[in-house]
Amino acid sequence: MPIDPVALTADLVRCPSVTPEEGGALDLIERILSGAGFDCTRVDRNGVPNLFARWGRKGANRTFGFNGHTDVVPVGDAAAWTRDPFGGEIADGWLWGRGATDMKSGVAAFVAAAVDFVQETPPDGAVVLTITGDEEGDAADGTVALLDWMAAEGEAMSVCLVGEPTCPERLGEMMKIGRRGSMTAFFTARGVQGHSAYPHRAKNPVAALARLIDRLSSHDLDRGTEHFDASTLAVTTFDTGNPATNVIPALCRATVNIRFNDAHSGASLTRWLEEEAARVTAETGVEIALSAKISGESFLTPPGELSELVARAVEAETGLRPEPSTSGGTSDARFVRAHCPVVEFGLVGKTMHQVDERVEVGQIEPLKAIYLRILKDYFA
């Protein structure tokens, strides 16, 4: 009997899988896949739950992979929700709950499509699912752990589809063929504390750091590249921790986040930030230290066989030709891209991470149909 992706989405939403808790979501998926003949392995690392499942022969020449996650962000104030965030309630044409959009519906749709596919038309090849419980957190022991385990065990994917929400307004209008890189820069300015009436006796870290931040935020990183929009820099914090209005503090901190395209790398941007900080230090005498965290480099799966496969299936099922895009935030595709070509396609993501997160019920079955067509066309 075909799996109902709507019912499965509701069941997954009822699993309270807030990172790093598994909440029963991976257990549910494992039971379904095992019952359909998939070889399932739990690849848990440092207490983080992950699931690897394969139908077909290990090392098959053609192995279609899927990547997704069942962990969700916290609900925030549960009293602010119209409905139980872990109720999986269907009302007014919507399925409500945390993770309904991001991305339990996408996981449910592919699980349903994969089970139907291997049972109805067993392919000459293999189908692999990599499902993590650590995408919304640090992501150090999620998809990365799965890929590390696969490499050690001789498991592979020829191509991979990530089921994250990709469509801004309508199902079918956008797929992701790459993502911008992301880095966060933490600045600490150390000056000399003093009385605000005698600024010449102090070294003001606030003024120095403000000068640096102004230069960074007014600098055009680039004008965009062939497949990417212009890189962006956003100031996200500026703190002194100083409650006194007549004291120049000794310390000031600021944070900026950069989303960068393929004109840059994390290393090149770090060098630029260090150079700018050194210039301001030389001008003001205030030491400015930098600590940079690079969450992921930019990447691109050039338009070609995989993106065309996805685009044809989407257009056949929705009538829309998806725009190949690299916009938005990061995803676990940034890890998969080192393993095999990867494209992302999923539902409309307007309510993800919000209070009253919900997915339009009428999108879930068509998403399953798209995924099923992708599988059939890939193995045709």
UniProtKB/Swiss-Prot annotation:
Pfam families: M20_dimer, Peptidase_M20
Binding residues for Zn(2+) 2: 102, 136, 353
EC number: 3.5.1.18
Entry keyword set: Amino-acid biosynthesis, Cobalt, Diaminopimelate biosynthesis, Hydrolase, Lysine biosynthesis, Metal-binding, Zinc
Catalysed transformations (reactions): N-succinyl-(2S,6S)-2,6-diaminopimelate + H2O = (2S,6S)-2,6-diaminopimelate + succinate
Single GO molecular function: acetylornithine deacetylase activity
Cofactor requirement: Zn(2+); Co(2+)
Cofactor note: Binds 2 Zn(2+) or Co(2+) ions per subunit.
Catalytic residue list: 71, 135
A GO BP annotation: L-arginine biosynthetic process
Positions annotated to bind Zn(2+) 1: 69, 102, 164
Metabolic or biological pathway: Amino-acid biosynthesis; L-lysine biosynthesis via DAP pathway; LL-2,6-diaminopimelate from (S)-tetrahydrodipicolinate (succinylase route): step 3/3
Family classification: Belongs to the peptidase M20A family. DapE subfamily.
Subunit structure: Homodimer.
HAMAP family listed in its UniProt record: DapE
PANTHER family per the UniProt record, alphabetical: ACETYLORNITHINE DEACETYLASE (PTHR43808), N-ACETYL-L-CITRULLINE DEACETYLASE (PTHR43808:SF31)
Role played: Catalyzes the hydrolysis of N-succinyl-L,L-diaminopimelic acid (SDAP), forming succinate and LL-2,6-diaminopimelate (DAP), an intermediate involved in the bacterial biosynthesis of lysine and meso-diaminopimelic acid, an essential component of bacterial cell walls.
Record protein name field: Succinyl-diaminopimelate desuccinylase
